[in-house]
From Swiss-Prot:
The lineage of its organism: Eukaryota, Viridiplantae, Streptophyta, Embryophyta, Anthocerotophyta. Pfam families: Ycf4. Seems to be required for the assembly of the photosystem I complex. It comes from the Eukaryota. NCBIfam families: PRK02542.1 (NF002712). One of its GO terms (cellular component) is chloroplast thylakoid membrane. This is Photosystem I assembly protein Ycf4. It comes from Anthoceros angustus (Hornwort). The chain crosses the membrane at residues 21-43, 58-80. Coiled coil: none annotated. One of its GO terms (biological process) is photosynthesis. It is found in: Plastid, Chloroplast thylakoid membrane. It is a multi-pass membrane protein. Belongs to the Ycf4 family. InterPro entries: PSI_Ycf4_assembly.
Amino acid sequence: MNWESEWFRIELIRGSRRISNFFWAFILLSGALGFLSVGLSSYFGKDLISFLSYEQIVFIPQGIVMCFYGIAGSAFSLYLWGTIFWNIGSGYNKFDKGKGIVCIYRWGFPGKNRRIRIEFSMKDIEAIGMEVQEGFYPRRTLRLKIKGQQDVPLTYIGENLTLREIEEEAAELARFLQISIEGF
């Protein structure tokens, strides 16, 4: 969702609260708890969950390995649920012609640097960079080329924009900032 006037433009960036992240976090947690319960069932010698039988699993070495996979999967699932809860990567791009500044704002992990804010002058922007890589895992990103600094990404890496959408977004932004578009 974007908002634009003659002197002001805001682009909202969607973070990690995506349907795919919810799906994978749930699947990973379910599988990890299944592995952990079968591993613990083989240790205790009784079924902790009735439909997951432990009888074919000897605790050493299969039960230990299943417990390890269950703990590792639970930890990774907890990480995914944390990124969803804190909405890591969400934020906005603000372009203000009146003040002549660009502000890139993102939410990070909790701590001292949770709020990530990059601010620079519009005079320092050289061009809009558009990177397009086709193939099995296509990558399409927009970047701001800034004098004397590294490029600043404007789009989320996991965002699956079509070539037409990324071109339209680049053209709108270039028209608003009155600068050129370059390819990488």
